[in-house]
């Protein structure tokens, strides 16, 4: 979470250049690479990246504060030639600010975008859902389905993700146990869904900031938010190689700090996902800063397969400076790297790779 409004004018101009309709692809500067390689970052700026692979195309989005933009590409490592479109510009003042962590999903032959927004006061952040019935999300129109009521007190919520397991759809998100007073604690909740925009069960708390590595909110230089913020946010669903273990990755500690990192919750695929006892938390982060590679505060995961389905890639944001944005312009940018598997068939996220390093493109990528 962030408690200050960023200076976004330059960033907005950059992302919107050439981003108006499907026929006009966005052109941007990128580091040179051979046709069969790529370099990070994907964009110079951008937080909370998310992508989906569907029918040979990748659909990518990330937070831009006042609008939702969607990119379409057959090569997720070459965003310089992706087609870009603004798919949502809110008009309702109650949800027109701080549009954070959009995620696109394809559910029952329709497209849905989940995101968080508020009225200018981040204490009023809530979850919202957009729907588009067009077969192509770059066509048709995204329309507001409404806000997701996460609990009877109309409590705070950000960074929702949804997944289906054994015919049941679930929503996971970051929320408060109660309204903030002098400090803030963000926790991971899960609930069953009646449809893509309505919960069908009470929310269930499955993770709260408890380890020291989950409770960092002061930067190395002493800069900090106005009050303590203890963070579990950005849940993202994944699975073991044999699909017998479900995984919810999440981000922990302040996103403005180099200590922002990735934690992991696991559950047996046969267990009751609404029972907190079904979930086991890793006692250590599974993806964190690399001093050697000068990558700080990695988090905000999203997973996509290679075009031929033989590999998995992780998209995340990170920064190249140790002290982050408690009041300065956005310093995070999105990156992508291949993941591996350990001897037990669990994902091995590795370490964040250095920006500017040359990496092989995902298997099956059509080279241009």
Regions found by a protein language model. Name each.
Residues 19-368:
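Carbohydrate-active catalytic/glycan-binding domains of CAZyme proteins
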Residues 1-30:
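Bacterial Sec-dependent N-terminal signal peptides
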């Amino acid at each position: 979470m962030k408690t200050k409004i960023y200076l976004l004018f330059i960033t907005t101009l950059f992302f919107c250049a050439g981003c108006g309709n499907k026929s006009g692809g966005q052109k941007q500067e990128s580091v040179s690479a051979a046709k069969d390689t790529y370099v990070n970052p994907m964009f110079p700026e951008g937080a909370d990246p998310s992508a989906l692979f569907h029918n040979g195309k990748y659909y990518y989005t990330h937070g831009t504060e006042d609008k939702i933009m969607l990119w379409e590409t057959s090569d997720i490592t070459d965003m310089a030639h992706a087609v870009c479109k603004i798919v949502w510009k809110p008009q309702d003042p109650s949800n027109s600010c701080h549009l954070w962590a959009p995620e696109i999903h394809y559910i029952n032959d329709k497209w849905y975008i989940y995101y968080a927004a508020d009225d200018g006061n981040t204490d009023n952040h809530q979850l919202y859902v957009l729907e588009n019935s067009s077969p192509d999300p770059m066509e048709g129109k995204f329309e507001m389905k409404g806000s997701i009521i996460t609990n009877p007190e109309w409590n705070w919520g950000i960074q929702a993700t949804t997944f289906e397991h054994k015919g049941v759809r679930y929503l996971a998100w970051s929320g408060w146990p109660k309204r903030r007073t002098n400090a803030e604690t963000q926790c991971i909740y899960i609930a069953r869904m009646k449809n893509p925009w309505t919960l069908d069960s009470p929310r269930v708390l499955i993770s709260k900031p408890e380890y020291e590595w989950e409770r960092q909110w002061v930067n190395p230089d002493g800069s900090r938010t106005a009050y303590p913020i203890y963070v579990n946010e950005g849940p993202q669903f994944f699975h073991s190689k044999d699909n017998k273990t479900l995984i919810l990755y999440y981000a922990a500690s302040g996103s403005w700090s180099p200590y922002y990192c990735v934690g992991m919750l696991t559950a047996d695929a046969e267990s009751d996902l609404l029972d907190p006892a079904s979930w086991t938390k890793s006692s250590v982060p599974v993806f964190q800063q690399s001093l050697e590679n000068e990558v700080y505060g990695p988090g905000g995961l999203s997973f996509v397969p290679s075009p031929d389905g033989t590999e998995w890639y992780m998209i995340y944001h990170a920064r190249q400076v140790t002290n982050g944005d408690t009041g300065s312009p956005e310093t995070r940018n999105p990156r992508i790297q291949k993941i591996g598997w350990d001897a037990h068939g669990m994902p091995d996220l590795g370490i964040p790779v250095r920006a500017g390093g040359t990496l092989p493109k995902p298997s099956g990528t059509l080279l241009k």
